[in-house]
Every structure is written in C-alpha cells, then in structure tokens.
C-alpha cells in the first residue's frame, strides 16, 4: 500500500505540467484586446523544458543511477525522418541523455525489425526506445508500435499507453499532443469550460490532443475540462467554420495549408498550429515550411498563435526528452501492474 502511494506521488510530480515558466506572459483576457496576437515561441518554451529535464537528469545521475539512454531505430532514407532523428539526438545530448541511432535499410523485413525491437526491449542499458515513423509500406506500423515495451515507449504509441491515456491514467503521453498541452498550460490559456476545436483525428496527434483537453482535471492524469469538437477530412469547410468561429481555442493538425483563415476565428481566440506542410515559395522559388493556419491573416485577429516553424515542433522534441527521463526512473512500470518494488522506491522493508 505504501509503495503504491509513493509511486503515485512520484509519478504525479513527473507528469504534472510545470508552472514555473520564466517567460513573461500576458493574461489570456488581455491578449484579446491587442491589435495583434501574442506569438508563442515554442523554441523558448522547449528550451525551458529541456533545462528542467537536464537538471532532473543530473540529479538522477548524482544519486548513483546510470545516465538515461535513448535508442532510436531509423529505417530507410527519408530525408525528413533523418532530420527529425538528428533533432532528437541533439536534444538528448543537450539534456545529458545518452543516445544512439540504429539505421536499417528500407528493405528490412518486418520480422527482422521486430527481432531488433525485442532485443532492445530486453537490454537493461536502454531506457527509452522509439521507431521513427513513417515506415516502408511492407511493414505494419501498428504492429511495430505495439512491439515496443510500454515502459520504454517514449513516443507513447503502444496500445497500453494510448488506452491508459484515454482512461485518464498515468502513461507515456505522445510527445506532440503533450507539447500542445504544455504550450496551453504554460502560456496561461484557460481550458476549463472553454470551447475547443481540434482539426484532425489522427491516432498519434489529433485524437490524443482532444483526449488531453476534454478529460477531467481531477483525475489521475488531469485533463483540461474543455468542450471539444473534432473535425476531419470529411468535415466541409463551411461546417468547420461554424465550430471554429465559436471556439476559444483552435488546434489544427490536419496537414492542409491555409485550412484555418482569419474569417474562421473569433476575436481573441488561441490558435495552435500543429500542421507541417512543404509548399512552393513564389518569392524565393524554393520549398518552405508552413502550417495549417494562414499565419499573417489569423495573427491580426487571434489572441495567441503559434508559428510554423518554431511552434509545436520544438515542444515535441522537448517532451520526448521528458518521457525518456520518466522511462529511466521506471516510475510507471506498466508491465508490472503499476506497482514498484519497495527496493526501487527506497522504502525500508522488514
């Protein structure tokens, strides 16, 4: 009983959003009277979170524990995947986490990949494990995600972690949705009783964002107590507008450039852009990254807005580092029915 209680307290401390933000942030209701939205810097927030993780890692190591280790499996030659993995391993170095990238050709069989995952699952030196998505078409991504040990699943994609998140229980939260949640909480944007629209229903991004925002703030894994509407590819834009124009918070994770425009947003709303789209820039004649939101138009009307790039992206990497230290501390122990052994908790036994 004592072990379970102590585990819950330790898990709560690790998984709770921090409120010691050093950024000077404008109260939500005041942002609405500005001529232009407050642009939320995901880079600054991510830097703060990485500083918190680094301090936690060094305290963990100073207490006699081994330095956390993250293993990343990268399949194929997708340039975007290589870039994302490089960002993750660089962030790991910044926060004091050891990391390795295991590169495999796109021709690797599903069984070979499963065998590699099983080997890393059973390696005590590996605390966090992720397989960079997307994978080649001949490999079942869901089977691969479920093969990663839920205790090491720093992406939060295992069915156990997804299920526990949906039940408002402690779990490894998916990094991008958790990053969106932290942006909202650390910026001081209220969610209780507010109307939220999430554009996009993907199982790794849109759905988890909606779950985090609408669930009960008094539960084991506190939610936002918001009223959430989810749209998807079959939602006509005019129907979407009927919802967004009433929303206090609009989160777009659909992967459609200019999906959200100024006429769809009410004055003072918070707009979080999760979309990442490569489009042709007519000025430079080169590709450029944009989100789902017409940034220049919407910023004239919204209260808060995140840019692309520099918004949600850096937060995703920061939350991945947070999940890795959680995995290293073995706080969740999902495969052992959530109960830590007394010796792991430092509890004296007779």
Swiss-Prot record:
GO terms for molecular function: magnesium ion binding; methenyltetrahydrofolate cyclohydrolase activity; methylenetetrahydrofolate dehydrogenase (NAD+) activity; methylenetetrahydrofolate dehydrogenase (NADP+) activity; phosphate ion binding. GO terms for biological process: folic acid metabolic process; formate biosynthetic process; tetrahydrofolate interconversion; tetrahydrofolate metabolic process. This NAD-dependent bifunctional enzyme has very different kinetic properties than the larger NADP-dependent trifunctional enzyme and is unique in that it requires formation of an enzyme-magnesium complex to allow binding of NAD. Belongs to the tetrahydrofolate dehydrogenase/cyclohydrolase family. NAD(+) binds at residues 200-202, 233. It is found in: Mitochondrion. The modification N6-acetyllysine is found at residue 50. It catalyses: (6R)-5,10-methylene-5,6,7,8-tetrahydrofolate + NAD(+) = (6R)-5,10-methenyltetrahydrofolate + NADH; (6R)-5,10-methenyltetrahydrofolate + H2O = (6R)-10-formyltetrahydrofolate + H(+). SUPFAM superfamilies: Aminoacid dehydrogenase-like, N-terminal domain (SSF53223), NAD(P)-binding Rossmann-fold domains (SSF51735). Its cofactor is Mg(2+). Pfam families: THF_DHG_CYH (PF00763), THF_DHG_CYH_C (PF02882). This is Bifunctional methylenetetrahydrofolate dehydrogenase/cyclohydrolase, mitochondrial. Although its dehydrogenase activity is NAD-specific, it can also utilize NADP at a reduced efficiency. Keywords: Acetylation, Hydrolase, Isopeptide bond, Magnesium, Mitochondrion, Multifunctional enzyme, NAD, NADP, One-carbon metabolism, Oxidoreductase, Transit peptide, Ubl conjugation. Gene3D superfamilies: Leucine Dehydrogenase, chain A, domain 1, NAD(P)-binding Rossmann-like Domain. PROSITE patterns: THF_DHG_CYH_1, THF_DHG_CYH_2. GO terms for cellular component: extracellular space; mitochondrial matrix; mitochondrion. Disulfide bonds: none annotated. It comes from the Eukaryota. Changing residue 168 to E: Complete loss of NAD and NADP-dependent dehydrogenase specific activity. Its EC number is 1.5.1.15, 3.5.4.9. There is a cross-link at residue 50 (Glycyl lysine isopeptide (Lys-Gly) (interchain with G-Cter in SUMO2)).
């Amino acid at each position: 009983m004592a072990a379970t209680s102590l585990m819950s307290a330790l898990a709560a401390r690790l998984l709770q959003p921090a409120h010691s933000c050093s950024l000077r942030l404008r109260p939500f209701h005041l942002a609405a009277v500005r001529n232009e939205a407050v642009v939320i810097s995901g880079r600054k927030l991510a830097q703060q979170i990485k500083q918190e993780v680094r301090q936690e890692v060094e305290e963990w190591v100073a207490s006699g524990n081994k330095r956390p280790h993250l293993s990343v499996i990268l399949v194929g030659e997708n340039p975007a995947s290589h870039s994302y993995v490089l960002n993750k391993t660089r962030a790991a170095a910044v926060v004091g986490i050891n990391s390795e990238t295991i590169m495999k050709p796109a021709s690797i069989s599903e069984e070979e990949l499963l065998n590699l995952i099983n080997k890393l699952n059973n390696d005590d030196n590996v605390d966090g494990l992720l397989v960079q998505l997307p994978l080649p078409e001949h490999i079942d991504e869901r089977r691969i995600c479920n093969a990663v040990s839920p205790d090491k699943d720093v992406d939060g994609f295992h069915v156990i972690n997804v299920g526990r998140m949906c039940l408002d229980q402690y779990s490894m939260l998916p990094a991008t949705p958790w990053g969106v949640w932290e942006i909202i909480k650390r910026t001081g944007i209220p969610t209780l009783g507010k109307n939220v629209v999430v554009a996009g229903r993907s199982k790794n991004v849109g759905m988890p964002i909606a779950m985090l925002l609408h669930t009960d703030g008094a539960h084991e894994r506190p939610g936002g107590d918001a009223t959430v509407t989810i749209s998807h590819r079959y939602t006509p834009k005019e129907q979407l507008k009927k919802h967004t124009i009433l929303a206090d918070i609009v989160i777009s994770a659909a992967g459609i450039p200019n999906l959200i425009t100024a006429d769809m947003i009410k004055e003072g709303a918070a707009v979080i852009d999760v979309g990442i789209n490569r489009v042709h820039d007519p000025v430079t004649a080169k590709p450029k990254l944009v989100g789902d939101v017409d940034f220049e138009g919407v910023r004239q009307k919204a209260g808060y807005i995140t840019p692309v790039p520099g918004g949600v992206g850096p937060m995703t990497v920061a939350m991945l580092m947070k999940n890795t230290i959680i995995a290293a501390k073995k706080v969740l122990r999902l495969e052992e029915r959530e109960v830590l052994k007394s010796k792991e908790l430092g509890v004296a036994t007779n």
